C-alpha cells in the first residue's frame, strides 16, 4: 500500500454484490494497451477486462482459494476482507481482517493487506495493523500469529508475501500502515525490511536497504526473488539471486527502472506466471513483462492497480484496482501444472 495514493480513495461505501458492473459515471473503463504482438498469446486479442466488484475503500492483496473456488481480497483502511465467487458475488468474509481497536491517529491501515495460501490450504495474512504475518485455518477460522518481531523489535505494517516451494514465506514490511510513516512513535524497526520466515526458525532479514519495499514475488523455479520499491524518489523493481539456503547470494540488482513510467500509482504488487511472464503494478497500471524485462503491454484502469493474482482454472487474472476489482481471462497458465 502506498501513502501517496490516499487522495484516490473513495469514501467508505457499501460494496455492491453482483457478478459484474457497468462503469460508474466518471470512471474510466479498464483497457489493455498492446505494445508487442508477443502479448497476444498471453492476453488474447479479444479479451475484455471485467469489473466484478466496486465501491471498495482500497482494494488490495487478492488470493484465490482453490478449495472452495472463491477469491479473497483486502480493504486495509476499512479493516475488511471480502469474498467473491462467480456464483455468489461479493460478501464480507472477515472483519476485522487485521487488528481491532487501534488509534486511527496513529494507524491508518488497521486491516489485512497482502494475502497468500500456504501449501496446506491455510490463509496467510500480512496484517498491516498488527505488524505481523498471521495464519488462518479456513475451516475453523482459528487465527495464529506466526511472526511479529525481528531482533526483539516489532515489525511495522507487513504488506505482501510470496510463499516458496519449501514453505518459506518472504514478506515486505514498509511503514505504510502508520499514519506518520517512518516518524511514527509506533515504529520500532530501524529498517523497512524484506524478510524470510520459516516456522520454528529465527526470522531472517533478506534486505534492509530498500526505503519502501512493497510487492514481492518468486520466479517459477524459486531462484529469484523480486521486490518492488514504492518510494516516489526511487521507484524501481529489483531482484535477488537466491542460494540453496533461500537467502540472497549478493546485493539486489535492478530489474525495472520505474522512474520514467507515467500514470497513476507506484511500483506495488506483482505475480509471475508459470512461464515466467510477469504482471507488475507500476505507474500507469499493471505492466506485462517478459522474464528479461521487455514491456509487452499494460492494463490500465485510470487509477493505481495495487496487486493481482491468478485464479479459477489458473488462466484468470484478478486485479485489485483502487476502489474496484477486475477480472481478465489469459491465454497462459498462471500456476505451474
Give each language-model segment a name.
Residues 7-24:
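N-terminal export signals
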Residues 23-337:
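Sequence-structural signature of mature extracellular/luminal beta-sheet repeat domains
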Amino acid at each position: 500500500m502506498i501513502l501517496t495514493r490516499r487522495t484516490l480513495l473513495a469514501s467508505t461505501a457499501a460494496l455492491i454484490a453482483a457478478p459484474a458492473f457497468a462503469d460508474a459515471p466518471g470512471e474510466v473503463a479498464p483497457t489493455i494497451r498492446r505494445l508487442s504482438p508477443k502479448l497476444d498469446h498471453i492476453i488474447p486479442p479479444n479479451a475484455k477486462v471485467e469489473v466484478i466488484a466496486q465501491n471498495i475503500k482500497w482494494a488490495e492483496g487478492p488470493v484465490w482459494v482453490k478449495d472452495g473456488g472463491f477469491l479473497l481480497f483486502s480493504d486495509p483502511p476499512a479493516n475488511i476482507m471480502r469474498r467473491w465467487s462467480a456464483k455468489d458475488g461479493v460478501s464480507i468474509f472477515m472483519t476485522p481482517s487485521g487488528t481491532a481497536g487501534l488509534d486511527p491517529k496513529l494507524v491508518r491501515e488497521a486491516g489485512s493487506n497482502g494475502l497468500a495460501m500456504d501449501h496446506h490450504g491455510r490463509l496467510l495474512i500480512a496484517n498491516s495493523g498488527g505488524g505481523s504475518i498471521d495464519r488462518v485455518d479456513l475451516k475453523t477460522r482459528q487465527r495464529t500469529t506466526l511472526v511479529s518481531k525481528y531482533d526483539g523489535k516489532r515489525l511495522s505494517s507487513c504488506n505482501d508475501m510470496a510463499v516458496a516451494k519449501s514453505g518459506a514465506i518472504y514478506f515486505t514490511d514498509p511503514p505504510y500502515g502508520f499514519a506518520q510513516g517512518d516518524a511514527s512513535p509506533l515504529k520500532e524497526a530501524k529498517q523497512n525490511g524484506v524478510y524470510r520466515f520459516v516456522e520454528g526458525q529465527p526470522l531472517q532479514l533478506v534486505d534492509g536497504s530498500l526505503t519502501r519495499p512493497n510487492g514481492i514475488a518468486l520466479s517459477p523455479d524459486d531462484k529469484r526473488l523480486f521486490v518492488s520499491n514504492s518510494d516516489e524518489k526511487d521507484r524501481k523493481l529489483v531482484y535477488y539471486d537466491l542460494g540453496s539456503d533461500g537467502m540472497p547470494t549478493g546485493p539486489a540488482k535492478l530489474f525495472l527502472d520505474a522512474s520514467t513510467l507515467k500514470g497513476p500509482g507506484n511500483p506495488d504488487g506483482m505475480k509471475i506466471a508459470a512461464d515466467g511472464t510477469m504482471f507488475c503494478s507500476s505507474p500507469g497500471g499493471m505492466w506485462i513483462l517478459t522474464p528479461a524485462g521487455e514491456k509487452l503491454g499494460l492494463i490500465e484502469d485510470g487509477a493505481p492497480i495495487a496487486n493481482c493474482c491468478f485464479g479459477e482454472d489458473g488462466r484468470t487474472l484478478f486485479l485489485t484496482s483502487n476502489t474496484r476489482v477486475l477480472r481478465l481471462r489469459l491465454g497462459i497458465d498462471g500456476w505451474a501444472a
